[in-house]
A protein has these predicted regions:
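Generic structural signal for well-ordered alpha-helices
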Residues: 24-28, 56-64, 106, 206-209
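A cross-domain feature marking catalytic cores of carbohydrate-active enzymes
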Residues: 12-16, 40-44, 85-87, 118-120, ...
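Active-site beta->alpha N-cap acidic-glycine motif
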Residues: 1-33, 79-82, 105-107, 111-112
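Active-site-adjacent pocket scaffolds in enzyme catalytic domains
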Residues: 71-219
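Glycine-rich, often proline-containing surface loops adjacent to acidic residues and nearby aromatics
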Residues: 7-9, 36-41, 79-86, 219-223
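Acidic-and-aromatic substrate-binding clefts and catalytic sites of carbohydrate-active enzymes
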Residues: 11-24, 45-54, 88-100, 126-127, ...
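Extended, histidine- and acidic-residue-enriched regions that form the cofactor-binding/catalytic faces
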Residues: 220-233
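Substrate-binding cleft of extracellular glycoside hydrolase catalytic domains
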Residues: 32-66
Length: 233
């Protein structure tokens, strides 16, 4: 347990299109014991704003009614959720338009109760944003893709702006781990059996100093894994 008495916790971003009640029941049991929370993950392709709304609303209903998940916003009374986009293609950010299709996705997510997106970083994918190692607000242009490519940093004492908060994980070049002994590998905060959290990786995570502006002593280190793959459990 930590100084506040909490267990280590994991955010389980479960894919809507792969729903299996017995899997969610087991994750729900872990969450009820204080080991994490359930959030929303989605893979889709050639979709529309209305199609996205239908998928998210249906899955929110399942998570809420059958698994006791998703907190309520005390101000609005609306259910809230965190989000990770499958294939990293948030807001139709792939140049070829695959694995999304919704240019106003950021607005739709905010409308449905999404409090923050946790998709990034995505490098070396071409969905990677220009803005890195940041916690910021993205303002959607409903007629263009990848509106989260830039944004306004979240800052202490400054009201929220834009449409959706984007919480990024560390992204850097690891000069201590080189491909062919020459080219530095991309550190994209992915943890798995084949990419273990070594000391040099953890040092890089800390050095990126992801924080809310005005509060530099609180560092946010968001790492991720495809935890349903048996070798990575």
């Amino acid at each position: 347990r930590d100084a506040d008495g909490f267990h280590p916790q994991h955010s389980f971003f479960y894919p809507e299109e792969e729903y299996e009640v017995h899997h969610l029941d087991q994750l729900q049991a872990l969450c009820e014991k204080g080991f994490g929370e359930l959030e929303v993950h989605l893979h889709h392709d050639n979709d529309t704003a209305d199609g996205l709304r239908e998928k998210i609303r249906r899955f929110m209903g399942i998570l809420t009614q059958q698994h006791g998940a998703l907190p309520i916003n005390k101000r609005t009374g609306q259910r809230m959720f965190g989000f990770i986009h499958g294939n990293w293609a948030l807001d139709n950010s792939r140049p070829d338009g695959r694995w999304c299709g919704v240019n106003d996705e950021i607005q739709v997510l905010a409308e449905l109760g999404c409090y923050a997106d946790f998709t990034l970083p995505s490098a070396p994918s071409d969905t990677q944003t220009a803005k890195i190692n940041s916690i910021y607000y993205a303002t959607d242009d409903p007629h263009k893709p990848c509106s989260h490519n830039h944004g306004v940093d979240v800052a202490v004492g400054v009201p929220a702006s834009g449409d959706l908060m984007i919480v990024q994980g560390p992204l850097a070049l690891n000069w201590r781990n080189r491909k062919w002994g020459l080219v530095p590998r991309i550190e994209n905060s992915d943890v798995r059996a084949s990419n273990q959290p070594t000391r040099d990786r953890v040092d890089l995570w800390v050095q990126q100093h992801i924080h809310v502006q005005g509060k530099p002593d609180w560092i946010f280190i968001k790492v991720h894994t495809h935890g349903a793959q048996e070798t990575d459990m």
